[in-house]
Every structure is written in C-alpha cells, then in structure tokens.
C-alpha cells in the first residue's frame, strides 16, 4: 500500500448516495472537440447527416488514423466552431438504434489476441481515444506502444462516485477489459485502487496497487509518480475504469458500449446520487428538475478541475465521470475576511469553521477576492504529495520558463494534478491553464 499524507479532501456539501438510478431520457449528445489536446479534425459528416452508433464523425489530422465515433444513433444537428474555426462540439439528436458492429470474442480468447487486431478494433470503434499519454495528456498515436498502462479504479475527487459500485455491476466486462489491455501493452497494466476488493484479471502482467490518503491519491498522475515516473523518453498511458468496462464490452459483444454512470451531486442538487446516462449527454437535459431554484453553474467533471457546461459545451465530457452543480457566488460580503466564519472553510484555518470536525460547506463559485500576486505561504506544499518543489514549479509556470519547469517535473503533470494548488492559491492563479501553455510550448520546441 502507498499512503499519501499530503493533499485535501474538500468538505463540500451534496455528497451523492452510492446507489445507481436511471437518469433522465437524453435527446441530444455531443462530442467536444476541445477536450482532445492538439486535435485538428477532418470532418466526415455535416449538419443533417444521419449517423449510426460507432460511425466515424471526424479524424485527427495531426494524429493520423485516430477516429472519433458517434456514441448514439441519430442525426447531426449542430457542428459548433469557435475562434480560428476550432471545433467546439458535434451535436447529435438521438434517434433509432442502428449501429456499426465489430468482431466479438470469447472471454478466454482475449488475453491471446494479436496486438494489431486489438488496436484495429479499438481505433475503428473510437475507443482508442479513451487512452491518454503522459507526458502531454494526448490520445496516443496508433503506431505507438506503451510499457505501462494505468487503470484508475479509484476516485478521490470531491463528490465522486465509488468505482466499486460501478465495477461490481460489470465485473465480467471489467476483467475482459483488463485482459485486452494486458495483450495490448508490452509491459504491465497497473490497476490502482483503494483497499476494497475488485474483480481480478489472471494475467501475469496485470498488477493491483493500493493507494490510500486524501485527494489527489486517486489521480493517474499520482499513481505514475510512485510506480512508473514518466519523462520525455518514458511514456505511460492512462484509462479510467468505466472505459475499461467499455473495452471489455466491445470485445465480448462486438458493440460499442457508451453507457456512463456519473455522480450528479453538489450543494444545490435536490437528490445527489449516481445516475446512468450516455457518453456526451446533454447536461441541461440530465439535470432538468434536479437542482434548486436560483442561478447555478453546471460543471462537467470535478468542482476542482471540471469545465463549465454552457452553450456548445453543455455536454458530458469524454473523460468525466461526474456532474457537479454549484450556486453562482454573486453576493459580496463586506469585510468577510474579518468575520469569525463558522460556516466558512479555509485551508489556513483563518475561520472558526476548522474547529467543527466533519462539517461540510455549501460552497459556491466565488473566489473570495480578486486576482493578486502569487504569495508562497506554504499552501502548495500542504496539498502536493508528489516529490517536487511546487512553489518553484508554479513560479516558473507563471513566468513561462519551460526549461526550468521541465527540470522541476512539469512533464509528469496534467491540469488535474494542479487543481488543488489553484484552489489553495491566495493569488487566484489558474495553474492548470498555465501548465497546458507550458506543455504546448515544450512539445512545439521538441
């Protein structure tokens, strides 16, 4: 067991009950183009086209051969683009149940499948995009291999679903997915979990590792740091547990599995719980009649590192397993910093709230102050469990010094790994965005 002592479990109200129920009927789904780092699409459909489930929608010009497929059968009703013609979303109106089918196999055949056959089926179905590389957090090239695939079978994000609830419901598919991954990699498959028991693959290169401690103990970046540190020449892939289930279903049934179980939770959700929906679901439809009156912000993903779901982005993200809802923090408080703060949370224990153990808070979107200078008062060190100097690294990200950032470990990180640093920052810096700018610069310069 690897125990993490540094970190932070955010005491936010609205924890979901760990029981799965069916979500609202979804009439629109979308693929969000900006989720895929560096992707430039070659479109295969236009508005008005009828598409089958698992039919190709677009390919990546910069990563030849990588295909992005439809999660449902229906009609393309919107192709939204932003500045410089960046693809924002391809929206599909759900209709019918036509689908593209693939080869299917018996469970005892999966571990002995040819690696090229596995790649072909994953690419053609669109499930290849479930993998993300470190460094850079991109979809891997289809001619690449990895000596380490990390399966995140735990989730320490605030308000997250408990993975064992989902995995135990799909245990056969989960094991089948692990068997496929074991044949895909030239090295090991690391299944990272809490201390709970999970269905196990019998393949010798599939290892289970237990992590314990506060968030970010459940992030792929944390697991890689301790088990297989990455660098420019040392690449690892990660995949979440629900995509492992989808891989298993694809090879067992020959059909693309796009069902998602997400946590619908937060301080303004009427009944926080786990809901069954579809990948790319319209979040406006999913949360309909589920939230309290007033101005709220719907977030695809974690409250720490998710994205605001509005307009052309108002859909469930490809890599997101939760939908968080917070009240917009529009109200200003005169001299709020000077008040006792019984119902306020502070990492630095500035308020009385820290005296009440186990208290949860109705947090909002307010940042409690305006932007200011970066102030190194030890907050970053409290929440960074990785063996690196966070204050120095974050300073270099602010200054745009990519050479120094690489020396300090920037290549190991993804935006989600710095989300807690953003949360505890007195200067209100968005370190995830600064990290992405730095990684883009490093990759461009080679």
UniProtKB/Swiss-Prot annotation:
Q: Which reaction does it catalyse?
A: a ubiquinone + n Na(+)(in) + NADH + H(+) = a ubiquinol + n Na(+)(out) + NAD(+)
Ordered alphabetically, the record's keywords are: Ion transport, NAD, Sodium, Sodium transport, Translocase, Transport, Ubiquinone
Chain ranges passing through the membrane: none
What molecular function does GO assign, one term?
A: oxidoreductase activity, acting on NAD(P)H, quinone or similar compound as acceptor
Domain of life from the UniProt record? Bacteria
A Pfam family that the UniProt record links to this protein? NQRA_SLBB
Q: Which GO terms describe its biological process?
A: sodium ion transport
Top EC category: translocase
Give its E.C. classification number: 7.2.1.1
Question: Known InterPro entries for this protein?
Answer: NqrA, NQRA_2nd, NqrA_C_domain, NQRA_N
> HAMAP family annotated for this entry?
NqrA (MF_00425)
User: Tell me, how does this one assemble?
Assistant: Composed of six subunits; NqrA, NqrB, NqrC, NqrD, NqrE and NqrF.
Write out the function statement from the record. NQR complex catalyzes the reduction of ubiquinone-1 to ubiquinol by two successive reactions, coupled with the transport of Na(+) ions from the cytoplasm to the periplasm. NqrA to NqrE are probably involved in the second step, the conversion of ubisemiquinone to ubiquinol.
PANTHER family in UniProt = NA(+)-TRANSLOCATING NADH-QUINONE REDUCTASE SUBUNIT A
Q: Which family does it belong to?
A: Belongs to the NqrA family.
Question: What is the name of the protein in this document?
Answer: Na(+)-translocating NADH-quinone reductase subunit A
Q: Which organism is it from?
A: Vibrio cholerae serotype O1 (strain ATCC 39541 / Classical Ogawa 395 / O395)
């Amino acid at each position: 067991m690897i125990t993490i002592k540094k970190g932070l479990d955010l005491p936010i109200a609205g924890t979901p009950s760990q029981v799965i129920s069916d979500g609202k009927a979804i009439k629109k789904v979308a693929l969000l183009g900006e989720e895929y780092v560096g992707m430039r699409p070659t479109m295969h459909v236009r508005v008005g086209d009828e598409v089958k489930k698992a039919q190709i929608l677009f390919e990546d010009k910069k990563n030849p051969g990588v295909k992005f497929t439809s999660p449902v059968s229906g009609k393309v009703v919107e192709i939204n683009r932003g500045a410089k013609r960046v693809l924002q979303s391809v929206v599909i109106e759900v209709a019918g149940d036509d689908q593209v089918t693939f080869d299917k196999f018996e469970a005892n055949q999966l571990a002995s499948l040819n690696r090229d056959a596995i790649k072909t089926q994953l690419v053609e179905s669109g499930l290849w995009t479930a993998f993300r590389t470190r460094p850079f957090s991109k979809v891997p090239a289809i001619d690449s291999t990895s000596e380490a695939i990390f399966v995140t079978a735990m989730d320490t994000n605030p308000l997250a679903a408990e993975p064992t609830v989902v995995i135990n419901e799909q245990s056969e598919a989960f094991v089948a997915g692990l068997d496929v991954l074991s044949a895909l990699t030239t090295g090991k498959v690391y299944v990272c979990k809490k201390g709970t028991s999970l269905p196990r693959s019998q393949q010798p290169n599939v290892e289970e590792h237990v992590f314990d401690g506060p968030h970010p103990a459940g992030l792929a970046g944390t697991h890689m740091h301790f088990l297989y540190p990455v660098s420019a020449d040392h690449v690892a892939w990660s995949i979440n547990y629900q995509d492992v289930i989808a891989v298993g279903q694809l090879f067992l049934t020959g059909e693309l599995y796009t069902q998602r179980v997400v946590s619908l939770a937060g301080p303004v959700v009427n009944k926080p719980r786990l809901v069954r929906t579809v990948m790319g679901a319209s979040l406006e439809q999913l949360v309909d009649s589920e939230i309290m009156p007033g101005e709220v912000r719907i977030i695809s993903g974690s409250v720490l590192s998710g994205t605001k779901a509005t307009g052309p982005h108002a859909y469930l993200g490809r890599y997101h397993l939760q939908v968080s809802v917070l009240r917009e923090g529009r109200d200003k408080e005169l001299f709020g910093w000077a008040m006792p703060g019984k119902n306020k949370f502070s990492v630095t224990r500035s308020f009385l709230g820290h005296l009440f153990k186990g208290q949860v808070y109705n947090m909002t979107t307010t940042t409690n102050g305006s932007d200011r200078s970066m102030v190194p008062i030890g907050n970053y060190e409290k929440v960074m469990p990785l063996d690196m100097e966070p204050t120095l690294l974050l300073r270099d990200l602010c200054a745009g010094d990519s050479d120094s950032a690489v020396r300090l470990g920037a290549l190991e990180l993804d935006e989600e790994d710095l989300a807690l640093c953003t949360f505890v920052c007195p200067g209100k810096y968005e370190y995830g965005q600064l990290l992405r700018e730095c990684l883009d610069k490093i990759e461009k310069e080679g």
